[in-house]
């Protein structure tokens, strides 16, 4: 399997981001809100992730390259990049794919994109297969910027 050429610079970028992981805000109920601008900026009034207790919640993530906020090419590469972005945020928040509690995936064409989502998930979780996290995949009429896929996850942080 060949990963996109962006992966090596992305690893260095993630290493920097992990070193900088601090909440942007902590609520009175001790919920940390993260919007790490060193990854990519959100395009609206939401944050990329939050932590409540030992649970990390990652918002819907698309297939942007963090280095330049352009979308990966349509198809498998975009689906993979969306999952890699979620993985990167999980690691930034102190978790990893093996601690994923639940996935929710939105696609604009179930028959076209679900097989690619399955391939990417099998690839990324190959070390723990067949213990995949619970997943809901939904076909939606439209995603932001007419994108094809968006993935969100809930992760366990440990005790």
Task: Briefly describe each language-model feature range.
Residues 3-84, 88-93, 98-101, 107-159:
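N-terminal presequence-like segments and the immediate start of the first folded domain
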């Amino acid at each position: 399997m060949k990963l996109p050429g962006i992966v090596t610079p992305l690893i260095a970028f993630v290493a920097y981001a992990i070193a900088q992981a601090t909440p942007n805000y902590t609520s009175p109920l001790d919920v940390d809100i993260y919007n790490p601008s060193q990854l990519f900026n959100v395009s609206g009034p939401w944050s990329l992730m939050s932590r409540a207790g030992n649970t990390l919640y990652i918002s819907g993530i698309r297939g942007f390259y963090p280095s330049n906020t352009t979308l990966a090419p349509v198809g498998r590469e975009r689906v993979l990049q969306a999952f890699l972005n979620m993985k990167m945020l999980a690691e930034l928040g102190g978790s990893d794919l093996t601690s994923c509690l639940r996935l929710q995936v939105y696609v604009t064409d179930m028959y076209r994109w679900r097989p690619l989502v399955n391939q990417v998930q099998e690839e990324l979780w190959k070390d723990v297969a067949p213990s995949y996290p619970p997943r809901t995949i939904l076909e939606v009429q439209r995603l932001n910027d007419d994108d094809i896929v968006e993935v969100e996850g809930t992760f366990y942080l440990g005790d």
